[in-house]
């Protein structure tokens, strides 16, 4: 860590910015983590795409089907790659935020302490999956307060539909007062995240993984962080970086130019969206990666791989998307 616990909020306001992507995990034929393939993906994301940061070992990465040592290994390789790349010719080091979410609090703390020890920049933990509805707000607040007490590293909240509930902006704002809470990935509707931005946008980063709305959120809400999903490396190539481009233009106040670039990506978005089978985002993302020349591969159970028909539909959509490969 390059900051003290008391400095976490200030540090994140300056450094937890830009376009961040959530990794997919390549497995070999025996469904073990393919470390060579993953390192090559990391090099592409960090050096070719020059992403602001990477979100490691989350849902897209299939953390739920990994052992604790495997999750730690993903984190270690990611931190090593970011550190080895350095400041990338002056644009700054690629940040690393590790997803330490689990239903077991001891596992969450073990992964978060490991992240802190190996040099990750931040950790993110999704709100607990609750099986009973009584005193939900107090339960969630105490969960994050306990994590904040136990950790020095910057901590991001994460609330999504899989948790079974939506945290209210008021609850999120209360948690945002904790000393090392620095951000929230708020996978909810715009009314909620707009309200939360109005409440605490000067204290923590508020973000949402919908890439289509990212430009509007920069312009209208003053957002500085896309946190995050797979679009930064599925919608972009080494020679076609329109998401990065419209982000830079918008940050520079060139909103009309940014809008033109943003809108030009719609055929790619549509191809990616329309060819994605319901319930198979990881398998589809990996198939798209393979078409891009990245390392995708298979998914682990309980997830299902694409059928041959779904693969063919994905190939056709990819070929018609207009995404430039060279």
Regions found by a protein language model. Give the residues of each.
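Active-site beta->alpha loop and helix N-cap motifs at the rims of alpha/beta catalytic domains
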Residues: 2-164, 302-305, 324
């Amino acid at each position: 860590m390059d900051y003290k616990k008391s400095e976490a909020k200030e540090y994140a306001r300056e450094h937890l910015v830009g376009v961040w992507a959530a990794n997919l995990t390549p497995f070999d034929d025996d469904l073990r983590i393919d470390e060579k393939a993953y390192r090559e993906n990391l090099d592409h994301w960090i050096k070719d795409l020059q992403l602001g940061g990477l979100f490691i070992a989350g849902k897209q990465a299939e953390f739920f089907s990994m052992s604790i040592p495997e999750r730690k290994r993903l984190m270690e390789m990611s931190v090593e790659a970011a550190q080895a790349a350095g400041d990338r010719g002056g644009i700054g080091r690629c940040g690393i935020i590790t997803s330490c979410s689990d239903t077991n609090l001891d596992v969450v703390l073990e992964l978060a302490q490991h992240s802190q020890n190996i040099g990750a920049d931040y950790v993110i933990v999704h709100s607990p999956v609750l099986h009973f509805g009584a005193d939900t707000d107090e339960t969630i607040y105490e969960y994050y307060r306990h994590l904040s007490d136990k950790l020095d590293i910057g901590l991001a909240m994460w609330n999504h539909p899989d948790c079974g509930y939506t945290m209210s902006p008021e609850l999120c704002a209360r948690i945002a007062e904790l000393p090392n809470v620095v951000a929230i990935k708020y996978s909810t509707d715009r009314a909620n995240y707009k309200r939360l931005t109005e409440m605490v946008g000067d204290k923590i980063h508020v973000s949402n993984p919908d890439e289509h709305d990212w430009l509007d959120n920069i312009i209208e809400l003053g957002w500085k962080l896309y946190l995050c999903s797979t679009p930064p490396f599925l919608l972009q190539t080494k020679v076609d970086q329109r998401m990065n481009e419209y982000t830079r233009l918008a940050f520079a106040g060139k909103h009309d130019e940014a809008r033109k670039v943003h809108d030009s990506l719609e055929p790619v978005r549509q191809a990616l969206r329309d060819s994605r089978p319901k319930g198979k985002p990881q398998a589809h993302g990996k198939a798209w990666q393979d078409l891009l020349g990245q390392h995708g591969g298979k998914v682990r159970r309980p997830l299902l791989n694409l059928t041959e028909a779904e693969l063919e539909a994905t190939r056709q959509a990819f070929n018609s998307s207009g995404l430039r490969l060279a």
